[in-house]
């Protein structure tokens, strides 16, 4: 973890999904000051009619997209908002998603709910000092 999961109604070529995954990983690692190797991205193509929302009272449901971000607990709301906006921009630019039909939801976890066998086991809990600790490429940083 972090685990960035995008649910969409459309289908996209693997090369486009790879481009989006790379952009999302790079942005998340930079903005959240984490080791990019801990980030996983899923782009779930649910197919036509796979995910819906009612945009206004008394309106019909419309197709939408949803980005779920499983992250370590403790990031300030302002930082989470900035990350959400940046990741939405990638989804809009790369996949052509509509901003008014894309939501972001965060699920926050303690570090010991994230296990990375190749990176030494459980992630440490997030601390405010991590944001100032240096570059996103640091292998000791968690998600």
Where are these regions (language model features)?
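A domain-level signal for the structural core that forms small-molecule/cofactor-binding pockets
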Residues: 1-143
